[in-house]
Amino acid sequence: MEAAAMAVTAATGALAPVLVKLAALLDDGECNLLEGSRSDAEFIRSELEAVHSLLTPNILGRMGDDDAACKDGLIAEVRELSYDLDDAVDDFLELNFEQRRSASPFGELKARVEERVSNRFSDWKLPAASLPPSSVHRRAGLPPPDAGLVGMHKRKEELIELLEQGSSDASRWRKRKPHVPLRIMGGEMQKIVFKIPMVDDKSRTKAMSLVASTVGVHSVAIAGDLRDQVVVVGDGIDSINLVSALRKKVGPAMFLEVSQVKEDVKEITAMLAPVKSICEFHEVKTICILGLPGGGKTTIARVLYHALGTQFQCRVFASISPSSSPSPNLTETLADIFAQAQLGVTDTLSTPYGGSGTGRALQQHLIDNISAFLLNKKYLIVIDDIWHWEEWEVIRKSIPKNDLGGRIIMTTRLNSIAEKCHTDDNDVFVYEVGDLDNNDAWSLSWGIATKSGAGNRIGTGEDNSCYDIVNMCYGMPLALIWLSSALVGEIEELGGAEVKKCRDLRHIEDGILDIPSLQPLAESLCLGYNHLPLYLRTLLLYCSAYHWSNRIERGRLVRRWIAEGFVSEEKEAEGYFGELINRGWITQHGDNNSYNYYEIHPVMLAFLRCKSKEYNFLTCLGLGSDTSTSASSPRLIRRLSLQGGYPVDCLSSMSMDVSHTCSLVVLGDVARPKGIPFYMFKRLRVLDLEDNKDIQDSHLQGICEQLSLRVRYLGLKGTRIRKLPQEMRKLKHLEILYVGSTRISELPQEIGELKHLRILDVRNTDITELPLQIRELQHLHTLDVRNTPISELPPQVGKLQNLKIMCVRSTGVRELPKEIGELNHLQTLDVRNTRVRELPWQAGQISQSLRVLAGDSGDGVRLPEGVCEALINGIPGATRAKCREVLSIAIIDRFGPPLVGIFKVPGSHMRIPKMIKDHFRVLSCLDIRLCHKLEDDDQKFLAEMPNLQTLVLRFEALPRQPITINGTGFQMLESFRVDSRVPRIAFHEDAMPNLKLLEFKFYAGPASNDAIGITNLKSLQKVVFRCSPWYKSDAPGISATIDVVKKEAEEHPNRPITLLINAGYKEISTESHGSSENIAGSSGIDTEPAQAQHDNLPAVRDDYKGKGILLDGRCPTCGRATKIEEETQDRVADIEIQTETTS
């Protein structure tokens, strides 16, 4: 709450941060404020601090409906004043010494504070929270059964089947499909017929080519007596987008027919089928209906309530009143449940308030009565609109579980509640209400228009605005109904001109809060909006900058929030983004195995745009915007979003004042005969031009010269710039620089002069190296160079003492500088899809919060624990320089990415190096390659290492005699891995008493039936065999060893022992239960995941090639096997990086 209280908000503007800035100005003795100006500033600070202390607990602390407070005239004045004061402080700081001595920056603001704030706040009271209409609180009764229930039949049948028959879907969650879902249902495919005036074969060819290239189209043909019809057959066709494309590219197109055709789609249906449980059919006792506001949750719940009502002894339909905290009317809700449950069951209703006491006692009395009454009855309980988990917990306690077939249906718009239900109760099935498909949406919208008699005036082809309504509503039933009704009201004004039509439709969008016929839709959206705390409302309102056709890039939006001052830390902002997803305002598409993207429903965006306009928070101008209204607005434009198609010349030709605009976001290519007039934006702090193809090098130079003094965020991702100009050094206050996906090939030396830079993102560029001047960026906490040709990081990165995130993913980097160990605040190091297999041992000094992402996995590798201090204190300074040559931290090895990094001794050795024995006894893990045997004194040293938990022994040549492990030492060891042609090892009684994991990596060699002795490993739980991809698991030496371990596993006292056996790509898990039938035969084993092929290869060490270095006991002749695999790894890594870059 404290962080939120100091942030910029939609209600109080920049009040909190500007007070901090003003205090710093007054405390700075070098600012040369004149006495009069100092007095003005102190007065302003004193008055506004009093206002802030009054507003903070009353507005920021409330989570209810404080919308009236945010729109209050006095609070609006304070909000605007805070922005102007922020500008005034920055204006003063830009002046030179002489100019400051004669300036009077705060005189006018002081007068405003006296006149408009001080005298009015003495008797000001927070406006009373306005309550939503009672119809919103309690939605009793059903809507009239008419054509408005389009698309509900399929949902009803699916839900009835779940309640009556249960589900074989092991996930217990029916996910909402993205908009325009696949149309494969019951083996049917779509047949769509369009009518298009096509005058010649050229236009027909153009139409057929366009249709044939559309996703989901299986066949296309020309039909009709005049050859003016296009017949399309396919599945998952976005018919609305297709007809729009035909109208633009060929001519006015219109639907003639949409129907289903029978096809054999068994193969496709199998691909789309949900994951089934093997032998179970789960009973569903509770259904949680999850969906967006206006998505039809309540409607389908009511339909079910009436359709199934006669099958139950008693039934209840109760709605929860939305509130900022668990409902104060929950006792009333329980009483309502009790009263409804008794209807038709008993002649005389019990008094729900029959118990004595109030508050919790009365609530508990009702819970007990409801539970006792329902215990022996078959019931149907519908609870509509759960807003708080605490509410559901209380209600759930009152509903007893019995075996009489009782069913519970609940609805919610909050993902977090649905997920918790799903996690806490195995009897719950989550049913996400999806969008109406385009055909049903079209039928609903067109039906409303024709029923009103306006259908013949809407027009056909490109003039039919129902197409645009359907496109904008994304299948949301409530929006389709009310927007179509509003369209009927506007129909007389619609004309054929595209721009005029867009303007009229934009008027409908922008009128969600004002047009009377849209009030039911507005009320539904207001419920969710008023449920948000103020800081989330601010972040959500900022999303109104997007057009509904834009996808939201999470990182881009989160960092703009930071630049705007809404949030201070990226981790905090990421959490807020996730909260907006959980509350249903932002929708995530994709999963953990695919690209994720985010979007906000178009109707919700329209609502947010209206709210943003009310607060003068953000002005959005796009195709169809009424520029005259924007120009005549009495309030200054604080934040501006220009969307594709907007004629930016209007900014110059109109009287629109953008001199106080602090944020400019340009989405897409705007209509620009002369370009964006950046000279008009005198106080810009955030400039986002990402993906704007009109921005080139010359524009960037002008931007740096005109906007140099205040810009904190500069987004140039996806533009056509090729070079960052030297004028970049003028951006003295720049904090975030995005130049990814551009054509730049180098960073200028002047980058070092951006002293306040916090985030530098150059991903997907042609940059080959980082300049040495990067060491000057002492405030940098994020450095992202992924997908660039960079092959080496300069040692100067070690000077970036505040760096928290470093991403070198998919680059040519193969080794990190030792200076990385000096980055004490580093939290995330991403080296996935690089040649980096090891970190310098100095990285062990970094905070234990560091997460290393390696290989091709999102799982983090933690650094070894508990040795940093011992390493630092136990090694003399003169010796530390040599440590890098004898020790590193392996983050990927032949066994794949470990969960914890392993200290590794590079190269091959005859014996364990003396430096390891002298200085590194404290290690918790060790990985070493020996030539062909483990000497007795070396084994004794390993056995006596006090902290050793993980040990990896690799043998260059096959040991002549088995290595014997007796019952002495290795008291802490939990994981032991052996890498050898054939594992020649034997465990004696009481060996390695705490060992849980035994892992072998082997190739081929002479077969041996010698016992390994795993029965002597008393704590053993798992044995893993990893066979080299160059050999098969049925090779004699390999299969013989596996057979020995199988037999011993059957005799182990800890049965079952898990055996994992693979041969290169796909892993198969088997458990020994005393029968060899449970263990996969070696000849039938598949291979391990492809990603592991290159991950499991050894690291490349250039340090020792051609340098003649021979460390303690190192063998110079036993490196052939290692060299072969190193060269193979290089080839694999080359292919991998090229693939990543081109994709």
UniProtKB/Swiss-Prot annotation:
Region ranges (Structured coiled coil (CC) domain): 1-190
GO annotation (BP), single: response to other organism
Lineage: Eukaryota, Viridiplantae, Streptophyta, Embryophyta, Tracheophyta
Domain NB-ARC, first and last residues per copy: 282-570
Organism: Oryza sativa subsp. japonica (Rice)
Similarity comment text for this entry: Belongs to the disease resistance NB-LRR family.
Protein's name according to its UniProt entry: Disease resistance protein Pikm1-TS
InterPro entries the record matches: Disease_R_plants (IPR044974), HMA_dom (IPR006121), Leu-rich_rpt_typical-subtyp (IPR003591), LRR_dom_sf (IPR032675), LRR_R13L4/SHOC2-like (IPR055414), NB-ARC (IPR002182), P-loop_NTPase (IPR027417), Rx_N (IPR041118)
Domain annotation HMA: ranges: 189-258
